């Protein structure tokens, strides 16, 4: 009798519409309960039984109940699941499989089975890729997943690499394919094989894409020729190899090995500017005045070169610092090093006054054994030879940016617009509290940005610099010429790494059109999105593998008194993050390790400080001594505490 009663239906509808609801993201805790975070200020408690219906990170709508003045959330509708495709470790019990997602806040095993077409016989400990198929908020009884790909077995020494690449859906190996002969591009190549071109790289580098040659002109000015490997001489636009490179967008450099953008036959051999091998190249010739200014008369041309020496960064740096047993093999090579050094100093000086120079940070190199074990982590400071190459590449990229802008009006540009205009007033207010007065309008111009950066670089510590970083916009890849505030340059277009960057291959094709005086179409916008997304994934993969290797390396230091110097890089409500100076590892110091009485402790992300009883005890950029309290291998996290 009540079944089709319209009054009852109306009443139900009314009750439903009057019941308070909230949309937010589920945050799990290790205690079984959770919270529905609606925004930075508001969250609702989710009791343990209700947490069984959801997963950490799910975006949901929940009904809000109030009982004895206490509010709680009952999950009702799934807006967006946190897990769709994921990696995890397989568990097997009584012929039933389940998978535990590889995520610090997801501890529960999800029942699963091998998807159709997956041949592997899964067993305990295997790593796999899975896809969620069922969710309790979608009317299913429980969570359920399909295993769509076998990654590797539990004891594989190379788990960090294979699991990380699978997580980010990145390629594991070099692309297939060969290039049999050079294309006829209708380009006249200047024969520069007699000139003393040299490459300067790490000892282990095989994919050498830049060679340098310098000479002094009669009037004392220096002429620099930058010759760059020429993969577009082998790879036709739209070909299978070109499309594979377009998808990869970059060579993926991970600790221990790389996954190239091009087949190794090209990247490490046919295109690589190997010593004493004749190679096609795209070249740029520029004239540099004594004060480092680049003359407007910039020439781009196709060439054939033969590198006369594969030089190594440390050898060249030691030799220039008069601290070397190594010697250049002849006077011609020695003269090249001296001239390139002069160019480096004058260009560095010019950039110091007219653009911006980055502070040198060391690169950290993992020394790995045969089985992927970490033998050592070496901090490699950026020395004078690194700077010679860096200054030459920046000069060459600046030349390409100008030529592409003036001749075509487009290219693949690296664009950075400095501060987000919406943040300009807040930025000026923050700087004022630290005694720096800037005009909110002026700081949005390239000149104003450079002026502020120079003032910040002159500060006794990097504390203020770290505070304003959050106001900066991100660098972007654009087909439209635009300034690069981070470098302090009016425009910047890279073409010096075409073996490892697809955007540089595009710029090569554009520069060749300029050389031939031909019209060419503007690159499609979607390619810049693909490159930005791939760059993001490659960086995450490098970080993830690094975290795993750092955890392995520091595992035996946990609970010992071994002290490490560490720079504070971030403060949050829960504690602070530090970077170990000697090896680059990131560790977390929980608030209770900073001070036992919670009420006397204030950790402020806003100010980048930790106060105890009202006194600032720690701040971002401080370097302190720490010991390793714990290494959690399952989450690859390192917990440190201030050294006593």
UniProtKB/Swiss-Prot annotation:
Residues 189-516 form the RNB domain. The keyword RNA-binding applies. Gene3D superfamilies: 2.40.50.640, Nucleic acid-binding proteins. Pfam families: OB_RNB (PF08206), RNB (PF00773), S1 (PF00575). Signal peptide: none annotated. GO terms for cellular component: cytosol. Keywords: Cytoplasm, Exonuclease, Hydrolase, Nuclease, RNA-binding. Its main location: cytoplasm. It comes from the Bacteria. It is found in: Cytoplasm. It catalyses: Exonucleolytic cleavage in the 3'- to 5'-direction to yield nucleoside 5'-phosphates. One of its GO terms (biological process) is mRNA catabolic process. Residues 561-643 form the S1 motif domain. Disulfide bonds: none annotated. GO terms for molecular function: exoribonuclease II activity; RNA binding. Belongs to the RNR ribonuclease family. RNase II subfamily. Involved in mRNA degradation. Hydrolyzes single-stranded polyribonucleotides processively in the 3' to 5' direction. This is Exoribonuclease 2. It comes from Salmonella typhi. The gene is rnb.
């Amino acid at each position: 009798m009540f079944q089709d009663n319209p009054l009852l239906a109306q009443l139900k509808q009314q009750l439903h519409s009057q019941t308070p609801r909230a949309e937010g993201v589920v945050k799990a805790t290790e205690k079984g309960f959770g919270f529905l975070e609606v925004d930075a200020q508001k969250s609702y408690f989710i009791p343990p039984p209700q947490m069984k219906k959801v997963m950490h990170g799910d975006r949901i709508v929940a009904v809000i109940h109030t009982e004895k003045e206490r509010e709680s959330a009952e999950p009702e509708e799934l807006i967006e699941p946190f897990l769709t495709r994921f990696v995890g470790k397989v568990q097997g019990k009584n012929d039933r499989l389940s998978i535990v997602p590889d995520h610090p806040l997801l501890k529960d095993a999800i029942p699963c089975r091998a998807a159709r077409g997956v041949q592997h016989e899964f067993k305990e400990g295997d790593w796999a890729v899975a896809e969620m198929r069922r969710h309790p908020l979608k009317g299913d009884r429980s969570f359920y997943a399909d295993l769509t790909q076998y990654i590797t077995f539990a004891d594989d020494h190379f788990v960090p690499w294979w699991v990380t690449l699978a997580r980010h859906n990145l390629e594991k190996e070099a692309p297939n394919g060969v290039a049999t002969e050079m294309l006829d591009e209708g380009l006249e190549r200047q024969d520069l094989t007699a000139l003393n071109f040299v490459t300067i790289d790490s000892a282990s580098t095989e994919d050498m894409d830049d060679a340098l040659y310098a000479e002094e002109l009669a009037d004392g000015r220096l002429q620099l020729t930058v010759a760059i490997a020429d993969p577009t001489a082998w790879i036709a636009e739209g070909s299978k190899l070109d499309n594979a490179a377009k998808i990869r967008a970059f060579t993926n450099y991970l600790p221990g090995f790389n996954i190239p953008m091009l087949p190794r036959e090209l990247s490490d051999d046919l295109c690589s500017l190997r010593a004493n091998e004749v190679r096609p190249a795209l070249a740029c010739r520029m004239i540099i005045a004594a004060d480092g200014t680049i003359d407007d008369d910039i020439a781009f041309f196709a060439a054939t070169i033969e590198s006369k020496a594969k030089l190594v960064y440390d050898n060249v740096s030691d030799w220039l610092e008069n601290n070397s047993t190594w010697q250049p093999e002849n006077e011609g090579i020695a003269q090249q090093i001296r001239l390139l050094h002069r160019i480096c100093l004058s260009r560095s000086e010019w950039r110091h006054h007219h653009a911006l120079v980055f502070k040198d940070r060391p690169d950290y190199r993992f020394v790995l054994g045969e089985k992927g074990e970490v033998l050592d982590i070496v901090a490699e400071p950026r020395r004078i030879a690194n700077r010679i190459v860096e200054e030459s590449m920046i000069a060459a990229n600046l030349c390409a940016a100008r030529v592409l802008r003036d001749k075509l009006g487009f290219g693949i540009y690296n664009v950075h617009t400095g501060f987000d205009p919406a943040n300009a007033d807040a930025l000026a207010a923050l700087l004022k509290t630290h005694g720096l007065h800037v005009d909110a309008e002026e700081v949005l111009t390239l000149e104003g940005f450079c002026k502020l950066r120079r003032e910040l670089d002159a500060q006794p510590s990097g504390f203020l610099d770290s505070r304003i970083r959050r106001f900066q916009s991100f660098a972007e890849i654009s087909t439209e010429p635009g300034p690069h505030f981070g470098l302090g340059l009016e425009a910047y277009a890279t073409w010096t790494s075409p073996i490892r960057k697809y955007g540089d291959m595009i710029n090569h094709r554009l520069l060749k059109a300029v050389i031939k005086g031909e019209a060419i179409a503007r690159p499609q916008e979607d390619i810049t999105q693909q490159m930005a997304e791939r760059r993001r994934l490659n960086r995450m993969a490098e970080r993830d593998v690094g975290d795993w290797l750092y955890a392995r390396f520091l595992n035996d230091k946990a609970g010992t008194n071994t002290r490490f110097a560490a720079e504070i890089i971030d403060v949050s409500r829960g504690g602070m993050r530090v970077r170990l100076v000697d090896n680059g590892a990131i560790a977390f110091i929980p608030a209770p390790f900073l001070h036992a009485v919670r009420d006397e402790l204030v950790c402020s992300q806003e100010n980048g400080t930790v106060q105890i009883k009202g006194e600032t005890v720690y701040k971002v950029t401080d370097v302190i001594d720490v010991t390793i309290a714990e290494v959690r291998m399952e989450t690859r996290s390192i917990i440190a505490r201030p050294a006593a």
